[in-house]
Amino acid sequence: MVSERNRLFTILIALFIVCEAMAVHPKIGLVFGGGGAKGAAEVGVLKVLEEAGVQVDYIAGTSIGSIVGGLYAAGYTAKELETMFQTQEWLSLLTDRKASLSNEPYQTIDGVTYIFGFPVMDRNSNIFGVMKGESVEQMLDSMLSVKGCKNFESLQIPFSCVTADIRAAQEVVISKGSVSKAMRASMSIPGIFKPVKLDDRLLVDGGMLNNLPVDVCRKMGADIVIAIDLQQNEQKPRKQTDLSMLSSLADLLGFGGILEWVTNRPDIEKYLENRQKADIYIHPNLPDADASSFGNKNAARMIQAGVVAAKQQLPELQRALIDK
């Protein structure tokens, strides 16, 4: 009888400890915004969070943020991601450059025209965009395989990848299936990369409609959302393109359409709203960087900018953890 009471008492104590642990630890979500090569700054933020012992429970990412966030969700450390940014031949990967044609000024093979190995025109497709992104997708798939996380279901941290459906003019959040294909879709800048066909959808860069997906991370269950914003130009509410008037985002896929989108930015209201809703807003200072600033020296500089920005917000994060 005494033994039975002791056993029940032990179980109750264990349950109490578990409940206390769950109550003490608010769920932390990490949002990786889009910004091309500037994504290196997000690695700098991760370095600071790791050093501070911050446990991330949910991740949402757009464009380059989907790559950094997805790989972190798979178990890659900030140090490993730093090495990736500083050593990968990003230009060749992203452009599907054919090394065998790198010395050829002009060559056409199977309807695709190459200039010094870079694809510039595809006569076989009626969708604007030349690069397939196959090289970078294969690299990402290999990196995910190393961690045993090729599918969303096997990731170490729950992850949502933001894309945009060019036919329906709708944001599409992917959280199941192939992680590398979702990443490839999320980074497919219209007019440069071909859209990714997934089920009955044609998907492009999620930054078209949601470049800082704080709302997505919140819906995943995050109590505290840390957002990393790579946008450098000050954005203000303005007259926008009414997406409901477009038959699809495909209407924006010509050169003129891309310029119109850049001018009107149909995602601005959502971006500003998400920025305000972030509990911790980290904004690396990258005045001389742009989406194409790849390379070892640029990566090192942007990573350091991420470190500086994250350290500035650490006290705010500590206060948020106490308040929750």
Where are the regions that the model predicts?
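Bacterial N-terminal signal peptides that target proteins for export
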Residues: M1-F9
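Patatin-like phospholipase
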Residues: M22-T62, G70-K324
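Bacterial N-terminal signal peptides
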Residues: T10-E20
